A protein has these predicted regions:
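Conserved SF2 helicase motif VI
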Residues: 104-126
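A short beta-strand element within the Helicase C-terminal
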Residues: 88-101, 125-128
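Conserved nucleotide-binding/hydrolysis micro-motifs of P-loop NTPases
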Residues: 32-34, 57-59, 83-86, 102-105, ...
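Interdomain linker/hinge connecting the two RecA-like lobes of the SF2 helicase core
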Residues: 1-8
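C-terminal accessory region of SF2 helicases/translocases
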Residues: 122-201
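Conserved helicase ATPase core of P-loop NTP-dependent helicases/translocases
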Residues: 48-82
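Conserved helicase motor "Helicase C" RecA-like lobe of SF1/SF2 P-loop NTPases
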Residues: 29-53
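SF2 helicase motor core recognition
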Residues: 35-39, 79-93, 112-120
Length: 201
């Protein structure tokens, strides 16, 4: 089980919800256990209508929670697990919080796709709370600066993960490991297919 009671990300989450008190937020994390613990940790800090959405709920409960989130007077925060959010679209919401990140960039694209749908009239704001020097921060930096995952769909994102996975994991475990060379190489590899495509026109 997880204990987020002293996690600085919960304090950050409380603040962003208070600062944007008219907006709705979709939060996605990897597991059903995390959804429950995030909800519990928030309850002690802020009074906000919150719905959860995960694979342990039956279809009727999921539909009900999704409808409550879609309602103008309903939940302002929907806390979703990875599997629970599959196949659902929430294009009426523009704030996406990635509480954690999967190592596979295609899964990140799927998360963004929950909001980035036909009918989305706003720019999507992606929030990624990280703890300094954590694995999560390194993964976020690699995705942002190396793969540009949060800005565009990456053709061949999976092959880039295969190519750099071991070095990425090594950077998680080795505190001295500098991420900059890996980011630089990844960016070069990501841009090569684009250059070939341009030349092939």
């Amino acid at each position: 089980s997880y204990d987020f009671s002293n996690d600085p990300r919960i304090n950050w989450l409380t603040k962003i919800l208070k600062d944007n008190d008219q907006d709705k937020f979709l939060l996605i994390c990897r597991t059903q256990q995390k959804t429950a613990e995030i909800e519990n940790s928030l309850r002690d800090k802020i009074n906000i209508k919150t719905a959860v959405f995960h694979e342990e709920l039956n279809l009727v409960q999921r539909d009900r929670n999704a409808a409550w989130f879609a309602d103008n007077e309903g939940a302002r925060l929907l806390i979703c697990s990875e599997i629970g959010s599959e196949g659902r679209n929430f294009q009426f919401c523009r704030h996406l919080i990635l509480f954690d990140l999967p190592i596979n960039p295609e899964l990140i694209e799927q998360r963004i796709g929950r909001l980035d749908r036909i009918g989305q009239i706003n720019d999507i704001l992606i929030h990624i709370p990280t703890i300094e020097k954590s694995q999560h921060e390194k993964l976020a930096k690699w995705n942002h600066y190396g793969l540009n995952t949060f800005e565009e769909n990456i053709p061949g994102g999976q092959s880039l993960i295969t190519q750099y996975r071991e070095r990425l994991i090594d950077s998680f475990e080795n505190k001295q490991n500098d991420l900059a060379p890996l980011i630089k190489e990844t960016k070069k590899s990501r841009e090569e297919p684009k250059i070939k495509l341009e030349q092939g026109k």
